[in-house]
């Protein structure tokens, strides 16, 4: 997990004791007043994961907003640095941080930032991340650690054909459908139900006709609950929300084309949510023309739970929900990322 560490001081910024840098000598300064700017230092603690198409742990640029009662501040840093120092007047602020949008977002009000939409076209080499909290800048002080969370979900999937049917069924392609084109970066607004706000990702042709593994990143798409779905076998295109995200897997059978549809979501029946900063690990085994064994794990930093799951057809599987944030005990993609004592 990435953490932003902010330090406010009236004098020159002081390195935190937990950092490897030594403390700078303190210098006497007059007490801060509402008309006296104070220096605020921002520190970012992260370790890079192994190189991949999208580096989900990278911080490449930062927009910082302080929204106060009488004054707002905006700071833009086009490149990562060990720390950033800026001056603001003492007061109570809502602090908002946005990373990896690759542009100066400019000054805006808090309501404008909440309504701001990020386009998926910008998610090429990294993932946008955000954080916010209320802070009181009184003078020389250390602000609480600020955790930055990803504005996208990670779908890690493996598709394979069971050995018993591999002579007759050959994998050909996979495609993610109903993928959001944009998302708000703050708040919990419901996802759009307008089909024009979604697209079908490129078809990925599969060379190995028996197994295929890959990772797909997508913006949040929470299509909510369909309470009328009480049987997992009814989690199908006929009953799913029109904009719910799903995987379309195409294979060749004996003189026929086979298509398997797998909906994403957070339970075995009624839920069709793919939330930001979650990791879904999907192990899909095709066992016949009308049968696909689907094991889905959803990782999220907010909760844990388990349930039985059947996706679209009759095969029962396991559906686990465990923390997404990397911990000392669980490192799913990279090691050494600081996750805090709670994990």
Task: Give residue ranges: language-model regions.
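A short, amphipathic beta-strand motif
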Residues: 38-46, 155-161
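C-terminal functional modules
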Residues: 303-304, 310, 317-325
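C-terminal motif of bacterial Sec signal peptides marking the signal peptidase cleavage site
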Residues: 15-18
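Bacterial signal peptide processing site
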Residues: 20-23
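Surface-exposed binding patches on compact interaction domains or structured appendages
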Residues: 325-343
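Positively charged n-region of N-terminal signal peptides that target proteins for export
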Residues: 1-5
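Tryptophan-paired
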Residues: 49-112, 158, 162-276, 321
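Extracellular beta-sheet/turn segments enriched in Thr/Pro/Gly and aliphatic residues
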Residues: 114-162, 267-312
């Amino acid at each position: 997990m990435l953490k932003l560490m902010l330090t406010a001081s009236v004098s020159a910024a002081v390195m935190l004791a937990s950092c490897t840098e030594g403390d700078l000598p303190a210098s006497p300064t007059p007490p801060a007043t509402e008309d006296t700017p104070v220096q605020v230092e921002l520190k970012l603690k992260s370790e890079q994961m192994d190189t991949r198409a999208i580096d989900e742990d990278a911080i490449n640029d930062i927009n910082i907003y302080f929204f106060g009662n009488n004054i707002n501040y905006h700071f833009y840093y086009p490149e990562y640095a060990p720390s950033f120092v800026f001056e603001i007047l003492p007061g109570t602020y809502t602090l908002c941080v946005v990373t990896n949008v690759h542009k100066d977002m400019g000054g805006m009000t808090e309501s404008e930032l909440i309504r701001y939409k990020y386009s998926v076209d910008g998610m090429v080499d990294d993932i946008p991340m955000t954080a916010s909290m209320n802070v009181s800048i009184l003078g020389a002080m250390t602000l609480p650690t600020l955790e930055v969370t990803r504005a996208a979900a990670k779908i890690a999937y493996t598709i394979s054909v069971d050995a018993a049917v591999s002579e007759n069924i050959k994998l050909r392609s996979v495609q993610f459908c109903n993928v959001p084109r944009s998302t708000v970066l703050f708040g919990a607004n419901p996802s759009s139900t307008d089909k024009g706000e979604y697209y079908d990702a490129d078809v990925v042709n599969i060379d190995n006709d028996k197994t295929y593994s890959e990772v797909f990143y997508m913006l949040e798409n929470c299509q909510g609950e369909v309470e009328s779905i009480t049987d997992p076998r009814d989690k199908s295109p006929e009953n799913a929300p029109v904009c719910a995200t799903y995987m379309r897997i195409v294979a060749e059978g004996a003189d026929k084309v086979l298509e398997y549809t797998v909906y994403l979501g957070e339970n075995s029946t009624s839920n069709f949510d793919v939330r930001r900063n979650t990791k879904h690990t999907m192990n899909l085994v095709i066992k016949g023309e009308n049968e696909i064994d689907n094991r889905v794990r959803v990782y999220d930093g907010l909760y844990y739970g388990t349930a039985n799951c059947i996706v679209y057809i009759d095969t029962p599987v396991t559906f686990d929900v465990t923390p997404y944030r990397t911990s000392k005990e669980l490192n799913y993609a990279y090691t050494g990322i600081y996750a805090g004592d709670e994990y």
